[in-house]
Amino acid sequence: MIAEIISIGTELLHGDIVDTNSAYLAEKLTGCGIDVHYISTVGDNKQRLYKTLQQAVERADLIITTGGLGPTMDDLTREAISEITTCPLVMRPDLVIDIEGYFNHKRTTMTPNNLKQSYLPEGAIPINNPVGTAPGILLEKDNYIIISLPGVPREMKIMFEESVLPYIKKKNNLMIISKELHFIGIGESTLETKLEDIMDSMNPSLALLAGDGEVKLKITGKGRTKKKIENKISEIVKTVRNRVGEYIYGEDETSLPDEIGKLLSKRGVTIALAESCTGGLIGARITDIPGSSAYFKGGVIAYSNEVKINHLGVNKNTINKEGAVSPETAAEMASGVRQRLEADIGLSVTGIAGPEGGTDEKPVGLVYVGLAGIDGEVKTYKLNFKGDRNKNRWLTTQSAFYYLYRYLKFSFK
Amino acid sequence: MIAEIISIGTELLHGDIVDTNSAYLAEKLTGCGIDVHYISTVGDNKQRLYKTLQQAVERADLIITTGGLGPTMDDLTREAISEITTCPLVMRPDLVIDIEGYFNHKRTTMTPNNLKQSYLPEGAIPINNPVGTAPGILLEKDNYIIISLPGVPREMKIMFEESVLPYIKKKNNLMIISKELHFIGIGESTLETKLEDIMDSMNPSLALLAGDGEVKLKITGKGRTKKKIENKISEIVKTVRNRVGEYIYGEDETSLPDEIGKLLSKRGVTIALAESCTGGLIGARITDIPGSSAYFKGGVIAYSNEVKINHLGVNKNTINKEGAVSPETAAEMASGVRQRLEADIGLSVTGIAGPEGGTDEKPVGLVYVGLAGIDGEVKTYKLNFKGDRNKNRWLTTQSAFYYLYRYLKFSFK
């Protein structure tokens, strides 16, 4: 089955918003074994919308549109589909009731233009919209299927998951299964070299995705039976784990803070943070995880030297002699926060995020991470980043998590 | 001038990555007064890429492609342009030198396939790539211009800004100027009602963009002279400021932490944070701003009650009697951090982010913000959010910034 995705809305052609709907739909369709050949974006312009739809029904089996289903004059999707499919728009009394019900429930007044949304091309099946007024459209013709969803991502996604996905799965019985392996502490090119001989494998296929200071390997298999595809994927995973297993920190939907949370819970220990250049970002990422209060005590954002001295117990002489950005300060911060917040583990970072504050000796991007373990012993790590402020701060959190993860995973007695 | 944007790459059709390049280019082109009629995405497939390009040169004056310029066999953009324009590919000795130079500089070995990137369609001008090996292509034909840029956003953006934008501005002399007003403390629909009579204005046009707990108004004017457009925009801005000026916190590229930073600097005062449910996210956002060390002392991430008591001086009885999520605790947290970190202002948040931890009396989404002013007086604010954990945490930071901003702007003596 060949699919085409069409995003409708002038705001997309102005670049006011990024079209995330298409990537979402493309991923879901690919996951069902459907080949997406084209993604098109077109504005709220009658003529160009017709042309784009006409072309799509000629070259694809399944056309999914998003946007242009609202009640205003700009919303042209309904009319365009009616025209292209030669199915006249007819009012659906059941939809009138739904739309009136929606406004009653919200206790707001319905304006007459909302009734436009109760018209569908003849023969179309309305797709229920549990979170808005615009119903979707599903229309089967001899050679193609058109599905129209609203442009608001939240509405589109709920309707796709609840109604469209089950329908498509029935129509198309080729299955695609993917598995993701998450790596930390190894670069994309090194990984590619180590896996060179299997990277070209066709089924399952392998793809490396790098970004945000880590690398993912996506393994995708196609077939008719789940069992067979999963077996093929397992074989690849086994090969990869044999070669570079020590750099894999997780599979599928996960993140470093997620895996660290699991390890801390499993070992029944708590952690506290002392953050300088990250200003709270490590804490924000740790507490992103629901239930993190079980192992996260809290932290000190020690942005000024006073706070480092008064609230973490860093020695004034250490800062004067070695500087606030030094392994010695990082070590005292980690020890200090561990003791003062009565945690089992203390993690600290101090560095120069930029753009100001760098010197020849201590350039922008220099960062020290301190890790005080459960026995009180402290290790420090030196890092040199080359990014801008944002990137340096993010990579600092990634590195801190990396050392913490390895400590919890491998060095913990 | 009518433009079309084409994104090339199978990874886009799989939904592995979201196409942010097109929105970036669309915004820049719109800003130059160029109408973008279509955005298309096509995979690394010869036949479909040719068709898409052929169609584009027939209906647009300016075609910008991204992706498919790399050295591998999958990269087909160069060949496709050569075919469509009937300009044969010729090797450019100057580009060979550039590419060899790039590898020498990086001290890595050049593989022969990299030389593919030294071939350009005859008559094309290479676009310098300061951060990678793939040069871009600029080819002027009688009826259209094709510009090809790499798909890596960082490379694409630098090349667009440095080389393409100046070229396009010369070619097209209609000007578009935009101004953005940032609102906080007023909802999209209220704002729309208050501006109803001017929302339909054509030139300048007005658009409301809501998201992330705030609303933006984008005012866009078109014309031939800068002065005239700016005057028209100024009139609209004046009208808007007269009606809803108190909710405007900034113009154009800015953010709440940015404006708060400016106010703190201007007034020469410092701030400290006591964060519970946000776990460091407020600090992370404040320290996103370069130079924030001038006014940000630091903070305490008081995730556990122990930390609230021992490191912020919250009274144990307050927590036992009123609970950790209460106006009383928020007030003591704000006072405590202000005193202990010797800051002029203390800002605190405590709440239930979810998904667990809610009760009938104190449901998920209940948050208290505490603000201890320069005179030591404390105010607290109650909030009820209805989102998931992520959204509740983000909206908590937005609200805390809102109260802080209003304090600094209006109540400060």
UniProtKB/Swiss-Prot annotation, chains A, B:
Which residues are in coiled coils?
none
* Highest taxon of source: Bacteria
Q: Which family does it belong to?
A: Belongs to the CinA family.
Q: What is this protein called?
A: Putative competence-damage inducible protein
